[in-house]
Amino acid sequence: MKHWSIDYSIKYIDGTVKEEQATLEAENITIALGMALGNIRKPMLQDPEISDVVIWGVGIVEDEVFDE
């Protein structure tokens, strides 16, 4: 398993935009993106104060690019 950095922005109904980052553990980038959609974006959109959530970056954690 690798650790994946997920960058996303949250847009609130008042127009405020907040950038966040999370780290997920997944086998590959496709699974990491799916987890981000299901575990980050979908639950946040249920909050009435949030108008949109955009995932704009998914990348492997730098220290794990090459096995030692």
Can you describe what each PLM-predicted range is?
Residues 9-13, 27-29, 58, 63:
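Generic structural motif
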Residues 42-68:
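Short, mixed-charge low-complexity intrinsically disordered segments
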Residues 27-48:
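A short, charged, amphipathic alpha-helix used as a generic interaction element across diverse proteins
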Residues 16-31:
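A short, exposed loop/beta-hairpin motif centered on an aromatic-Gly-Thr core
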Residues 1-17:
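Short aromatic-glycine-(Arg/Gly/Cys) micro-motifs in beta-strand/loop hairpins
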Residues 4-6, 20-22, 56:
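Hydrophobic residues positioned within well-ordered beta-strands of beta-sheet architectures
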